């Protein structure tokens, strides 16, 4: 085996010289080098997004072109409607003010906020009282335990004094500049709409200062019919009420961010000068890839798989994957402290996305470009700790954005692990990764830096998720850097599978066919032994190897596979003359993605895929399920189907069983799909269409928790608006 002239790895003919795939078996990584992942270019040479240009699909909150730093706010008439963020400084924002005699007067919210925050605040109790004064609905419900613990117990007296005498006044001054720094309406990035929003880092710091002080209206209630029930929370009150050591460390990260970006009264030199762009991508299902027809060779994907390192540290210049909750940020403003939450507190500018990003639907993703990192950390989950300042040296692009691109894609939550091998659900994960990884520029796409997406608390199988992401990268012609977070065995297993794909010329369609066969096998086993369902990770790879061996043993199949591997969907035609034998195609130009993005289609999801496909916002609020509920409903439908199959196999002679068999098989003996079964499940009244609390929410940990994870109940909530 030898290196090709373009730096790629030539086709594997023998198992000699394995050090060419890694410098040594002692190295933490396998596959190709990071230089190959970067296509033998400089790490930041390839761009993830085009330059900032204002237009109908891209709202820019600062003046273009940028003539001074930080950029000046763009001015346009304010809006107070359901398509824009309702700002606390808007003249329409009002709130009941309590008078000394016990009566109430409707007052301008911003005036109440100014009066409360401009008073001397010297203790944690006074800070809580100030925040409660313009959130009086929650006087008996908000108890800022974490904030009290941090300021009164965790920090020493000098640190606490500095907070109240220096940092808090700076945060307040920055927050009260909201009318000056945000002078045009902030659009909401809503369901089924492709839209981009660019803000200056200074504007983001102002918005986050307001979130720190809990000033945003209509964002505290938990009622299912509330206006923002499909949006993440943004005010910090839930974080202040949470418990656990990681909560205090997250607060330290956030306070450190404000130390870095809040100007003093006499010095504004620390004000950040860059910008950040948020892009919501929404795709049409009928234009997604037919994975059963993709001839893209899996072995052509340059793969670097590493047991050490992190996505944010080693994935510089690549598209970095956020293992997201569909409510952006997951539990970052609560108890959660896993991959997504950690990324959001070390790069707090990502938090502002929670203000305007509606929860992600199955064929949607959010790309965030330009967020700066401010903190170092150690540990994970309960062992997470803030470990000091981080100076981000990432270069900026021509628009002033740090060249750090992060894509938020949410995986399904599997209460029972065997459900994830269903064809319906594997295809959902493929399409979710596809809409996140697709590249819209004519230049070659940078590689993807990812890892065990949707595993851990969400119950995903890393062995399966790695294959699904490899399939998407093959389809799109993107190199793949995969981090196993210390799992050496999985690193070697995944790398070995990739080598097998290279040797056999295995294509996406061939692997998809094998995965579908495995799905049927698991389904058959679960029908016969519904209580066991021991779908082993290792068994999946063993099954794939056996199926590929069958292909090799059939005369003529090898030639067929070789012919199928002659093209990579998403890559240009022809090979470099100097690298005709190179398997990872590093220098090809990607073709235009095979997916259509629409501006404001109201019918992006077919009826059988969506229970909230109504034009009525009230109906959408009613039918919207939480993270856990949506997954639980799908898994329950899968269980019903499995149960139905058992009844059929038992050949019961009762009329009830006969009816069940008929319904399960449908007309012409066709087996119902999971999504059809789910629809039938709803129609029978077996599951309420009305939103409800998930019985499993309290059992989940980290990002698997519902965004509704709080310390109060819905029945105690009151509307926080009188607008």
UniProtKB/Swiss-Prot annotation:
Cellular compartments per GO CC: cytoplasm; nucleoplasm; nucleus; site of DNA damage
Compositional bias of kind Polar residues: 577-586, 609-619
Family listed: Belongs to the poly(ADP-ribose) glycohydrolase family.
Protein role: Poly(ADP-ribose) synthesized after DNA damage is only present transiently and is rapidly degraded by poly(ADP-ribose) glycohydrolase. Poly(ADP-ribose) metabolism is required for maintenance of the normal function of neuronal cells.
Classification via Pfam families: PARG_cat_C (PF05028), PARG_cat_N (PF20811)
Catalysed reaction, written as an equation: [(1''->2')-ADP-alpha-D-ribose](n) + H2O = [(1''->2')-ADP-alpha-D-ribose](n-1) + ADP-D-ribose
Keyword entries, A-Z: Hydrolase, Phosphoprotein
Organism: Drosophila melanogaster (Fruit fly)
Modified residues (Phosphoserine): 24, 28, 579, 582-583
EC id: 3.2.1.143
Chain spans, region Disordered: 1-23, 554-593, 609-723
Biased amino acid composition, Low complexity: 632-664
Biased composition (Basic and acidic residues): 702-718
Protein name: Poly(ADP-ribose) glycohydrolase
GO MF: ADP-ribosylserine hydrolase activity; poly(ADP-ribose) glycohydrolase activity
InterPro entries assigned: PARG_cat_C, PARG_helical, Poly_GlycHdrlase
One BP annotation, GO: Cajal body organization
Enzyme class label: hydrolase
Knockout or disruption consequences: Progressive neurodegeneration. Knockdown of Parg leads to decreased survival when animals are exposed to stress with either hydrogen peroxide or environmental hypoxia.
